[in-house]
Each structure stands twice: as structure tokens, then as C-alpha cells.
From Swiss-Prot:
Phylogenetic placement of the source organism: Eukaryota, Viridiplantae, Streptophyta, Embryophyta, Tracheophyta
Induction profile: By photoperiod. Short days stimulate accumulation, while long days inhibit.
Family assignment from sequence similarity: To wound-inducible poplar endochitinases.
Record has Glycoprotein as a keyword: yes
Gene behind this protein: BSP
Expressing tissues: Bark tissue.
Natural source organism: Populus deltoides
Signal peptide range: 1-24
GO annotation, biological process: nucleoside metabolic process
Name of the featured protein: Bark storage protein B
Keyword set, alphabetical order: Glycoprotein, Signal, Storage protein
Length: 312
């Protein structure tokens, strides 16, 4: 019988495994990101090699690529921005491919420039959906976000009232559904990342653009995810003061929730591309943030044991 092509195998990811008579729980690492900038960082690095000329497959409008990243077997996919696209694409990845764990890299905004500035990479310890809320009636006494506190030039009443932040329901195959706010990064992978990246040197310049200082990797922070990108300083300060969130993006919590619901290992690498309330970084600095996040993700991937076939 003629052997199936790689693309056919990817359409039915267990086909090759069944032919080999290997019983295997996991085969590859899943690498996910949102933007063209992120994908360009991967391609520009020269570290990715496709398995063959026919090693990609389109599912539900997303293209999944099978190959190696500096020798480690991966499937990567560009998900598109915002939480619904990330969650949908990641669920397809986990349902259709044999994935050992999920690595996300992408861009985020800093909510505390004393902690992180453009070019730095954050490896958060926990992420949360801060866009899930109950908008209260005017003069409600409940709600953490009080719009009247932000009236200018003086505080006072505001018809927008207050907003109460809510937990989300997390489903899991082995536990009853439960409500959670903070979603913890897989502890073993977070610890592995802190060890692998503790002395990492990031890229400072791209083209003729250089960062004013040496970029660094920051560990152990918390991150906020919502479907709006936070550029407003007052709201960024609110998230920092009330939730101790140091970065904000539109996707990390979706990676966390989907991975946890499927009981998969996962880790997040955020390249800081701007500071809330300050002038937006130019495209070269934004790309540099993507590239540094990619470098951190790659070094982590190459530091963990490679998933093996059970019959090897």
C-alpha cells in the first residue's frame, strides 16, 4: 500500500502512529502565536525546518505547520488576535494533533515601566481574563472599577457607574467545572523556563533601531488578558494596582484556559512592545519584542526533554 503523504497524515494525525503500531500519548510540542510579526520572527531566525515540502494542512481556515525548531519537533500555527481566535485554533490543534504541551509567544504591553520596558520578555506565573465583568447599575455599591474615580479634573459621580470583575468557569475531563480567576502557568514548565533563561542575552538592535538599554527576561509576574488592547495609562494603573498585573494582552489567558481544560502543559512568553499611556513603539521595536519572545520560547523548547515514541 502506498505510504500516505505528510499532509494526509496531518489531516488524520493518528494515521502514522497506527501504521507503526506504537502506542503514544504525545508526539510534538505545539507553538502558537497571533501575528504576521511573530511568524516573521520564526522564519527570520533560520531555526525552523519543515518536515517536507508538503508538511502543512489547512483546518477551519487556519494553517498548521509540522517541522522542527532547532531540532525539536513542533506543530506551529498562527491563530489571529483576540481570545476567541486563540481558543478556537488551540482547541483544533489539541484535538487534531498529538501534542505534548503548548508554548505561546507574542507581544504585550507593559503596565509598569519600572518593571518592564519595550524589548523585555515577560514569563508570567499566572494570567487572568480581566475583560469578563458585570457592568453594574448607576450608584451600585458593588464593583471594583468605579468610573467616578476617574472623572477629570475632579472625582465624582459618573453615569457609567461601576464594573465588577468576574471569575470564569473552567472545565476539565478529570474534575467538576469550577470558577477561577487566576490561571496558573504549569509549574514544572515555569520552573524549567526560569532555569533555562536566567542568564539569557536578548537582542538589542534590529536594522538601525537599538533599544536604549539592555533588554531582560522578567519572571514571576501576573498578566491581564481582555479583548481590548490596553493603551490607556489610567486603566493600566488600575490593573496594576488592583490585580498586580504587570502586562496586558489579548490572548494569553485563552492559551491558559484551553490548555488547562485539556490538561496540557503550557507556558507563556510575552515580548513587551509598548508601555500603557506612552507613545506607541515603532514597527522595528515591536518586531524586536516579537523576536526576543521567540528567542526565549526557542531556548525553553530546546531545554526540555523531547517527547519520544513509546516504542523507541
Amino acid at each position: 500500500m502506498p505510504q500516505q503523504s505528510m499532509q494526509a497524515s496531518l489531516r488524520d494525525p493518528i494515521a502514522e502512529i497506527e501504521r507503526s503500531n506504537c502506542k503514544i500519548a504525545h508526539l510534538r510540542l505545539g507553538l502558537v502565536f497571533t501575528s504576521d510579526n511573530n511568524e516573521r520572527a520564526l522564519q527570520d531566525s533560520g531555526l525552523y525546518s519543515p518536515d517536507s515540502e508538503d508538511s502543512s494542512v489547512d483546518i477551519a481556515g487556519r494553517r498548521f505547520h509540522s517541522g522542527t525548531l532547532n531540532g525539536s519537533s513542533i506543530v506551529y500555527v498562527k491563530t489571529g488576535s483576540h481570545s476567541v481566535n486563540m481558543a478556537t485554533t488551540l482547541q483544533i490543534l489539541l484535538a487534531r494533533f498529538s501534542i505534548h504541551g503548548v508554548i505561546y509567544f507574542g507581544n504585550a504591553g507593559s503596565l509598569d515601566k519600572k518593571t518592564m520596558v519595550p524589548g523585555d520578555v515577560s514569563v508570567p506565573q499566572a494570567v487572568a481574563f480581566t475583560g469578563v465583568c458585570n457592568w453594574k447599575k448607576f450608584r451600585s455599591e458593588k464593583g471594583k472599577l468605579v468610573f467616578g474615580d476617574f472623572n477629570y479634573p475632579e472625582n465624582g459621580e459618573n453615569l457609567l457607574g461601576t464594573v465588577e470583575y468576574e471569575k470564569i468557569k473552567m472545565f476539565s475531563p478529570s474534575e467538576a467545572p469550577k470558577e477561577v480567576f487566576w490561571l496558573p502557568i504549569t509549574k514544572s514548565w515555569y520552573n524549567a523556563a526560569t532555569e533555562a533563561l536566567k542568564d539569557m542575552k536578548l537582542r538589542k538592535c534590529y536594522s538601525d533601531e537599538c533599544l536604549p538599554g539592555e533588554p531582560k527576561v522578567v519572571f514571576g509576574s501576573k498578566s491581564s488578558t481582555s479583548d481590548f488592547y490596553v493603551r490607556n495609562k489610567a486603566y493600566g494603573d488600575f490593573l496594576n494596582d488592583n490585580f498586580d498585573a504587570k502586562t496586558a494582552d489579548t490572548t494569553s489567558a485563552s492559551v491558559a484556559l484551553t490548555s488547562l481544560s485539556n490538561e496540557k502543559l503550557f507556558v507563556v512568553f510575552q515580548g513587551v512592545s509598548n508601555v500603557a499611556g506612552e507613545t506607541s513603539s515603532n514597527s522595528r521595536v515591536s518586531y524586536l519584542a516579537s523576536y526576543n519572545a521567540f528567542l526565549a520560547a526557542t531556548k525553553f523548547i530546546n531545554s526540555i526533554p523531547t517527547p519520544r515514541l513509546a516504542c523507541e
